[in-house]
């Protein structure tokens, strides 16, 4: 989230966020609700929304409108944090561009570095385990564009219902998918 806020000239860093959201460094989890709360209370000049059930086309529409998108995805650590650690964790990645010719997104990744090229297929695989959740941070003057792009997903309850239907269909077609 620090990278996202810095995109809009915020002058803090990840440690500023951690003071409020992760006071215990060993805690590997910060959820989207906590991130949205931080934006609303510490970067109030920006709007923030998060939704579930995103897809590749939606990401591209938002990026084409000049709105970076942060997604939550699966991440695997190389070294365990504790005995029997499965090395799996959540990770946020800020998408800033895409290339249809190469079927990739450009991601700003706090772990792997800037301008990472992420194939659409890999992004879908890693994003799926978090219900394709996405976070949007944007200035107020972009709200009309965000509403138009999200369409019926702008309404939070409608977004949840539509996503529930989508995942119920997926469970019927692939009951082996743990996510």
Whereabouts are the PLM-identified features?
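Short, Lys/Arg-enriched charge-dense amphipathic segments
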Residues: 34-45, 71-80, 95-99, 157-164
